[in-house]
Amino acid sequence: MARDFPLERVRNIGIAAHIDAGKTTTTERILFYSGVVHKIGEVHDGAAVTDWMAQERERGITITAAAISTSWQDHRINIIDTPGHVDFTIEVERSMRVLDGVIAVFCAVGGVQPQSETVWRQADRYSVPRMVFVNKMDRTGADFLKVNKQIKDRLKANALPIQLPIGAEGDLTGIIDLVANKAYLYKNDLGTDIEEAPIPSEMEEEAAEWRFKLMESVAENDEELIEIFLETGELSEEQLKKGIREGVLKHGLVPVLCGSAFKNKGVQLVLDAVVDYLPAPVDVKPIQGVLPSGKEDIRPSDDNAPFSALAFKVMSDPYGKLTFVRMYSGVLSKGSYVMNSTKDAKERISRLVILKADEREEVDELRAGDLGAVLGLKNTTTGDTLCNTEDPIVLETLFIPEPVISVAVEPKTKGDMEKLSKALTALSEEDPTFRVSTDPETNQTVIAGMGELHLEILVDRMLREFKVEANIGAPQVSYRETIRSSSKGEGKYARQTGGKGQYGHVIIEMEPAEVGKGFEFVNKIVGGAVPKEYIGPASNGMKETCESGVLAGYPLIDVKVTLVDGSFHDVDSSEMAFKIAGSMAFKDGVKKCNPVLLEPMMKVEVESPDDFLGSVIGDLSSRRGQVEGQSVDDGLSKVQAKVPLAEMFGYATQLRSMTQGRGIFSMEFANYEEVPRNVAEAIISKNQGNS
């Protein structure tokens, strides 16, 4: 089967932003103008195509990254609409991993928000080329050039306007295209009757100034263009387009466009810019992976290369389990068998679909560069690689942040226990930042996630999709333990109870590991002091103790253990004896290594009228917060602080009452830090009291 669109004419893009920048509305308009939907859906009416889960339609926020295919100017455009709420960072993270380009949407009034910085950093992590759409230019207080300056200053981006608005706030009548050096005037409310016109005389000077800056910046990166520009002082529309595209793909240039998606202005020009400036799969670096031999290799974006794809999302739906994949190379056919190289398991491809939000189109194959979904995969989860059995490769996977908040959950009726277990399994398969575990002491089921809203929505989904009513406990902070110094540890387990005894003995050296390493085990046994078959069990004993902690029952992180010596008995030694000895040695070592308790610290940004600045700062300090920055702009104060998560429960209510309902805040995980001694002692004694 031949390709519908050559690879050069495919664009895999994401639309990313902070909450309320108008991202879902922008996606809706793109689908309307490119012919996927024939009626405009509004987020605040709860009718948007990409917001297809019931909770999204109710709350007006986008939770899951819906993948939709559309076309524009003979190009296939695959769009992923990503959530702006920080509790759903994994959705943004996983979409950035599989995209080739991003449209970052900013509100013309609010400008750069804390969540915008998070999304921008995620795009930086994966070196995703991007362009900016400054939306909501029809709103009171809209200021295009101010937002452009914020993007340069706060995001350290090489932002360059390629458009200017004609009028602003309620009088937005058109857009100046600096590349083509002309104006587009909107003649009807649907944005379908657009008149090309000369630049209005009152804006000629400003437009000429910005066009000169644009030509200068574009020419800087291209020797051929700089010569033409120095000689003639001018670049043609074609030369500018070529230079901007080069700049976006190679030099971090960020073209900035403007408009109002809600008022149907500027959206077709955004689509034109996607085609003109954002990369095709062949324009970005080939995906890297590791061969079974351990050698690094690449897979080029080419139908003739060996098949490779990354599963970036798993979803349960009425038709079965959908696994979203990004095709990197080769062709994937319906009915074929492939290899999950991450898990070393064979999978059968039952059906293949391309999505238009919650409508689907069955296809016989997916090709390099496509985004689609597979039905019928049994063992594949988020971040797994699928490839040919003859050409195995493991592609680089996703960065998955650790959950920071947990709650106990139980069904309202005993009969729902099995349903609850099914629901939790399905939800944790979909969302790798949602973890399910059982508390060994209380036997309660504990769910952990990225924030209160995240867990609230998951509990809501249990009720809607799985018909399980659940009771939820009070939120608990996910503390961690670690060590601050080095020491030796010894564990000797010897039991003699008639007949065969038990004997295991290990000596370890313990030291702090690099941050983010978790538990690191090194075997330095020489001369067979501990036989090979007992090293694995000893390591497992240590790992299990590590997971249940030593100080207060929280997982120990960033610990390096080196097995240096030990002894065994020909008859009495067993795997179980060495597992117990490993656990004993680990506990012994930790006690001598200055163990400490760590807590999740959150980056908090609070916005309120500046009359309340003193109260806001005072309140954050009383929550053990460290204020890291503050600014006042147009009577609005912004405070950035780092605050322990444990002190932030119920903050939304407190902030509302403190600021007469006019304060808003956003919060995201920053890092783990040591808990002050007096607070740690209280937590440890409380936990030991419960045990």
From Swiss-Prot:
It is found in: Cytoplasm. The keyword GTP-binding applies. GO terms for molecular function: GTP binding; GTPase activity; translation elongation factor activity. GO terms for biological process: ribosome disassembly. GTP binds at residues 17-24, 81-85, 135-138. GO terms for cellular component: cytoplasm. Its main location: cytoplasm. Keywords: Cytoplasm, Elongation factor, GTP-binding, Nucleotide-binding, Protein biosynthesis. Residues 8-282 form the tr-type G domain. PROSITE patterns: G_TR_1, G_TR_2. Signal peptide: none annotated. Transmembrane segments: none annotated. Catalyzes the GTP-dependent ribosomal translocation step during translation elongation. During this step, the ribosome changes from the pre-translocational (PRE) to the post-translocational (POST) state as the newly formed A-site-bound peptidyl-tRNA and P-site-bound deacylated tRNA move to the P and E sites, respectively. Catalyzes the coordinated movement of the two tRNA molecules, the mRNA and conformational changes in the ribosome. Belongs to the TRAFAC class translation factor GTPase superfamily. Classic translation factor GTPase family. EF-G/EF-2 subfamily. This is Elongation factor G. The gene is fusA.
